[in-house]
UniProtKB/Swiss-Prot annotation:
Swiss-Prot/TrEMBL keywords: Cell inner membrane, Cell membrane, Lipid biosynthesis, Lipid metabolism, Membrane, Phospholipid biosynthesis, Phospholipid metabolism, Transferase, Transmembrane, Transmembrane helix
Family listed: Belongs to the PlsY family.
The protein's name in its UniProt record: Glycerol-3-phosphate acyltransferase
GO terms for biological process, alphabetical: phospholipid biosynthetic process
GO annotations of cellular component type: plasma membrane
Disulfide bonds: none
Organism: Leptospira borgpetersenii serovar Hardjo-bovis (strain JB197)
An example Gene Ontology molecular-function term: acyl-phosphate glycerol-3-phosphate acyltransferase activity
Source organism superkingdom: Bacteria
Membrane topology, from the record: Multi-pass membrane protein
Length: 218
């Protein structure tokens, strides 16, 4: 029963739409109707300021950290496979939140939280790829896709070459599974990139004016 309860709580905690609620409370807006229409930290930061976007980022990462960390403490007999299951459920909760009609965010920050507990070195490598990609391409979506693709590779190479540990196929397989999910949640971003209509990581002047006009019409 403890396994089922913890699994349920992992999904529910992951489904808490912090970005949506914070934008609604402090920005007086439905964030799903502005910018990229995503509930994540980037869209919140771009739409109402990073003093709100950064807390959303921290909270979304925490949604991945706590289910994995606490399941390892309170249900140690479940081992890494159960920790991963709780992590996957948290990510799925973020992507398919019952609070938002089973729609949600991309799952990138929550995925980061999951693997920060289990494989921090791999996460730091993926964060580095994310930052370099954004620096070069100027799109958060491309950074997220590249980071999710490289996370399993960084994990495998860091385990073998740096930590001299055996690669856990539970962890590697879960990384691949979630990475595929993250890429699928970025389908619209990919289409916008191909159409040259994707929003930049930092607003330019035209986007700023358009955003102000949208808010003024509300």
């Amino acid at each position: 029963m403890n396994f089922a309860i913890f699994a349920f709580l992992s999904f529910i905690s992951g489904s808490i739409p912090f970005g949506y609620w914070i934008a609604l409370r402090f920005g007086k807006m439905d964030i799903r109707k502005f910018g990229s229409k995503n509930i994540g930290a980037t869209n919140v930061g771009r739409s109402i300021g990073w003093k709100f976007g950064f807390p959303v980022l921290v909270l979304d990462v925490a949604k991945g950290i706590f289910p994995v960390y606490l399941s390892g403490i309170y249900i140690p007999e479940g081992g890494v496979p159960f920790q991963l299951a709780c992590g996957v459920l948290a990510v799925l909760g973020h992507m398919f939140s019952p609070f938002l009609g089973f729609k949600g965010g991309k799952g990138v920050a929550t995925t980061l939280g999951v693997f920060l507990v289990l494989t921090p070195i791999a996460c730091f490598g993926a964060i580095f790829v994310f930052l370099v990609t954004i620096k070069y391409f100027k799109f958060v979506s491309i950074g997220s896709i590249f980071a999710s693709l490289t996370l399993p590779l960084v994990y495998a190479f860091s385990s073998i070459l740096l930590l001299h540990e055996e690669v856990s196929y539970w962890i590697l397989g879960t990384m691949v599974f979630i990475s595929i999910g993250i890429i699928l949640t970025h389908r619209e971003n990919i289409f916008r990139i191909l159409n040259r209509s994707e929003l930049f990581a930092v607003k330019n002047e035209d986007e700023e004016r358009n955003g102000d006009s949208e808010r003024n019409r509300r």
